[in-house]
Amino acid sequence: MSTRTRLLFYLTAWLIVLLPFLFWWNTWFGRQLPDQQITEYLRDDKRPRHIQHALVQIGERIMHHDLRAAQWYPELVRLATHPVEEVRNTDAWVMGQDTAGPGFHEALLKMLQDSSTMVRGNAALSLALFRDASGSRDASGRPQIVALLQPVHVLAPGAGRVTDTARVGTAIHQGGIVAKLQPATPSGALAAIEIRSPISGRIHLISTSTGATVAAGAEIATIDPGDEQVWEAMRALYLIGRAEDLPAIRPYERESRDIPDRVREQALLADQAIRSRASAQP
């Protein structure tokens, strides 16, 4: 092997190792950012993941009582209306880390009307940590929190032919592909539409089959919420839940291999706290 060939071989091997590392390094939200880079990332609208990275770093600083995090609070309020769903979702979580943040309470209340199921849910979870005008826990987002315990029905965005579907029982991330739909057009020239899950969880039911023709608004699938989502909802309902929420909570109290112990235990705690509050009322 010549020296030139050997060098090319080692260079190729080095790149095979380096490029995945660089990709991981640039997308890993745990990488610490200096203050100046956080400021730059928050304004990088061309790279939403940069904004998310900065938001996660700010959230961690708030949790560690780092007073320097307050310099970015106006940015957190601004990002509540960012066009990218993932940014708004992360932002809603971060604002819940400081209930004294100027403008946070008002921004989160507005986010309860967001077009995204997950953004509404995260805003509601954060609001449960705030106090309302009477000094009680803010229960404004309670309906959205209860909704986090319910399956989500995925609908066809338009008429067309189903060309592919995921399998029942498959775990799926938020944004994961549930089915593909070939739009019903005279020419058939439009590309297939990827129908994605609005939440992370598990596919409970596929309501159609490959090759079937569906109308706009037809149900494609039902997604059961993920364990983490349910657990967080139970924690919030422990604080603000009411007696009418118990029917949504109690299915998670049963012993089942599909329900992790931590979720079941949190459901039981929420149930107990709700009944205790109800019995204390005059």
Task: Kindly label every feature range from the protein language model.
Residues S2-T3, W28-L42, H64-A80, A100-Q113, ...:
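Amphipathic alpha-helical scaffolding segments comprising HEAT/armadillo-like alpha-solenoid repeats
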Residues K46-R47, P83-V84, S115-S116, G226, ...:
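Short inter-helical turns and helix N-cap capping residues of alpha-solenoid HEAT/ARM repeat scaffolds
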